[in-house]
Amino acid sequence: MTGPPRLSSDLDALLRRVAGHDQAAFAEFYDHTKSRVYGLVMRVLRDTGYSEETTQEIYLEVWRNASEFDSAKGSALAWLLTMAHRRAVDRVRCEQAGNQREVRYGAANVDPASDVVADLAIAGDERRRVTECLKALTDTQRQCIELAYYGGLTYVEVSRRLAANLSTIKSRMRDALRSLRNCLDVS
């Protein structure tokens, strides 16, 4: 197959070939789905490192369990995105459990100079500041930032998604980041 799959049936066929351990089919399946999977995982985890690691785990699971895909129950993309969402949510739960353990065990050794409430308030304030600064951007700048940083897309993918020249996207991103830096008073 050449070019992106036109129908979900193209991905279904690729996934069936992956079930037979066809490496070329796996590479093609990965190429056609990686942005969607990474974007979904990034929206759930909001951490680049964890998102990359989780995405890698998802594709390892695809390689091992492609034979479990049943096209009668849904499309290959739906199967993959469901798997990705579940894996990302599991990662969040695992991290939360780890954080709760750290809180329980660390409570006895609290540094009196540390103020958890103040730290949380500062983090919330920073989030609000970023949100306000994003609102100050033009619609096109905000759209570029959201696709690249929250959607996990590369500049090339953003330019394709918005049907704009790559140089235009780079200019919008540069201007948007400069505006955000100025708005947030970051040097």
UniProtKB/Swiss-Prot annotation:
One of the GO BP terms on file: regulation of DNA-templated transcription
GO MF, any single term: sigma factor activity
GO CC field: peptidoglycan-based cell wall; plasma membrane
Region (Sigma-70 factor domain-2): 30-96
Residue ranges flagged as DNA-binding region: 155-174
Sequence segments annotated as region (Sigma-70 factor domain-4): 133-182
Keyword entries, A-Z: DNA-binding, Sigma factor, Transcription, Transcription regulation
CDD domains: Sigma70_r4
Motif annotated as Interaction with polymerase core subunit RpoC, chain positions: 53-56
UniProt induction comment: Autoregulated.
PANTHER family associated with the record: ECF RNA POLYMERASE SIGMA FACTOR SIGK (PTHR43133:SF66), RNA POLYMERASE ECF-TYPE SIGMA FACTO (PTHR43133)
Assembly mode: Interacts transiently with the RNA polymerase catalytic core formed by RpoA, RpoB, RpoC and RpoZ (2 alpha, 1 beta, 1 beta' and 1 omega subunit) to form the RNA polymerase holoenzyme that can initiate transcription. Interacts (via sigma-70 factor domain 4) with anti-sigma-K factor RskA.
Annotated domain remarks: The sigma-70 factor domain-2 mediates sequence-specific interaction with the -10 element in promoter DNA, and plays an important role in melting the double-stranded DNA and the formation of the transcription bubble. The sigma-70 factor domain-2 mediates interaction with the RNA polymerase subunits RpoB and RpoC. The sigma-70 factor domain-4 contains a helix-turn-helix (H-T-H) motif that mediates interaction with the -35 element in promoter DNA. The domain also mediates interaction with the RNA polymerase subunit RpoA. Interactions between sigma-70 factor domain-4 and anti-sigma factors prevents interaction of sigma factors with the RNA polymerase catalytic core.
NCBIfam families per UniProt: PRK09646.1, sigma70-ECF
Job of this protein: Sigma factors are initiation factors that promote the attachment of RNA polymerase to specific initiation sites and are then released. Extracytoplasmic function (ECF) sigma factors are held in an inactive form by an anti-sigma factor until released by regulated intramembrane proteolysis. Sigma-K controls genes such as mpt70 and mpt83.
Extra information: Extracytoplasmic function (ECF) sigma factors are held in an inactive form by an anti-sigma factor until released by regulated intramembrane proteolysis (RIP). RIP occurs when an extracytoplasmic signal triggers a concerted proteolytic cascade to transmit information and elicit cellular responses. The membrane-spanning anti-sigma factor is first cut extracytoplasmically (site-1 protease, S1P), then within the membrane itself (site-2 protease, S2P, Rip1), while cytoplasmic proteases finish degrading the regulatory protein, liberating SigK.
Family in the record: Belongs to the sigma-70 factor family. ECF subfamily.
Name of this protein: ECF RNA polymerase sigma factor SigK
Species: Mycobacterium tuberculosis (strain ATCC 25618 / H37Rv)
Lineage: Bacteria, Bacillati, Actinomycetota, Actinomycetes, Mycobacteriales
